[in-house]
C-alpha cells in the first residue's frame, strides 16, 4: 500500500512504510535473543546447530513457496534480461544474501525498476538470516567467557552500529539501507530489551 503512493488532497494515505521493516528487526532481535538466553539459563549452553535447524524449518518452506510463485509469474511477465536477473535473485535468496545481491545490483528499493524484481522484498529476510547465523555464536562466547560484561558489550556493539548507520546515512546511503552492519542496531535494540527483562526476571504481567 505504501509503494502504491495513494494520495488524498496531495497527502499520502500510507506514509512511513519503511518503518515497518525497522519494527520487524527490533521484534526479531527481542524474540530470538529471548529464546537463546532462556536456553542458556536452562542448560548453561546454546545448541547452535539445533537453533539453525529450527530456523530453517520455520523459514525455508514459506521462502520456497514465495520463490515458486515468483518464478511462475516471472516467466509470464518478464523479458529475458529481467528473467536472468530474477534467476540470480533466486540463488541469492536461497543463499541468505538477497540484501547483498540487491545492493550491488544497484537498484533503489521502491523505484519503478526495482518493482520489476519479484523477490526484492526478501532483502530483509537476508539481513534477518545473517543475524541468525552470527547471534547464537557471538552470544554463546560472550555468556561463557565475558558474562559479567555481556550487557556492556551488547550496548557497545549497538552504539557502534548506530554510529556507523548515522555516518553512512549521508556517505553510503545504499549500503546503509541494505546491509547488516548498519541494520544491526535495530536488531540489537530488541536484544537489549530481552537482556534487561530476563536479567531482572520481569514477567509479561509486570510490563
Residue ranges and their predicted role:
Residues 1-207:
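Membrane-interface helix/loop caps of multi-pass membrane proteins
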Amino acid at each position: 500500500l505504501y509503494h502504491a503512493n495513494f494520495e488524498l488532497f496531495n497527502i499520502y494515505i500510507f506514509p512511513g512504510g519503511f518503518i515497518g521493516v525497522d519494527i520487524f528487526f527490533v521484534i526479531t532481535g527481542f524474540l530470538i535473543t529471548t529464546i537463546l538466553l532462556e536456553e542458556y539459563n536452562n542448560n548453561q549452553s546454546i545448541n547452535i546447530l539445533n537453533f539453525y535447524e529450527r530456523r530453517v524449518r520455520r523459514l525455508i518452506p514459506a521462502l520456497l513457496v514465495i520463490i515458486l510463485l515468483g518464478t511462475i509469474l516471472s516467466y509470464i511477465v518478464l523479458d529475458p534480461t529481467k528473467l536472468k536477473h530474477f534467476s540470480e535473485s533466486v540463488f541469492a535468496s536461497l543463499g541468505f544474501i538477497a540484501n547483498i545481491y540487491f545492493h550491488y545490483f544497484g537498484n533503489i528499493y521502491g523505484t519503478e525498476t526495482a518493482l520489476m524484481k519479484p523477490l526484492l522484498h526478501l532483502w530483509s529476510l537476508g539481513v534477518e538470516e545473517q543475524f541468525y547465523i552470527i547471534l547464537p555464536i557471538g552470544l554463546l562466547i560472550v555468556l561463557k567467557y565475558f558474562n559479567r560484561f555481556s550487557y556492556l558489550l551488547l550496548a557497545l556493539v549497538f552504539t557502534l552500529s548506530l554510529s556507523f548507520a548515522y555516518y553512512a546515512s549521508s556517505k553510503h546511503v545504499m549500503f546503509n539501507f541494505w546491509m547488516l552492519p548498519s541494520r544491526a542496531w535495530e536488531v540489537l535494540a530488541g536484544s537489549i530489551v530481552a537482556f534487561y527483562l530476563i536479567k531482572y526476571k520481569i514477567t509479561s504481567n509486570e510490563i
